[in-house]
């Protein structure tokens, strides 16, 4: 018999998971000397990285992708990314910006 999950319980569980994610934000040099911002530490099994990347790209007006368990955004967005991740429900104390 399949287990019936209350949608409210599932939402609360996801909120708790968001508050426990240790997230690291840093930059890397891409091709031709371009900079890209990397976001690591979001559990791709629990959260849709593509959806999070889509929201961040829209807010930051940049390109990017979600691959290999991390989000890559074109350009240096370290100064704004922490605030945006907090708006998405992640805990500010667990976001490390380098």
Curated annotation (Swiss-Prot):
Record has Protein biosynthesis as a keyword: yes
Keywords: Protein biosynthesis, Translation regulation
Gene3D superfamilies: SUI1-like domain
GO molecular function: mRNA binding; translation initiation factor activity
A GO BP entry: translation reinitiation
Entry keyword annotation includes NADP: no
Pfam families xrefs: SUI1 (PF01253)
Source species, domain of life: Archaea
HAMAP family named in the record: SUI1
Family: Belongs to the SUI1 family.
Name of the protein this chain belongs to: Protein translation factor SUI1 homolog
Annotated source species: Pyrococcus furiosus (strain ATCC 43587 / DSM 3638 / JCM 8422 / Vc1)
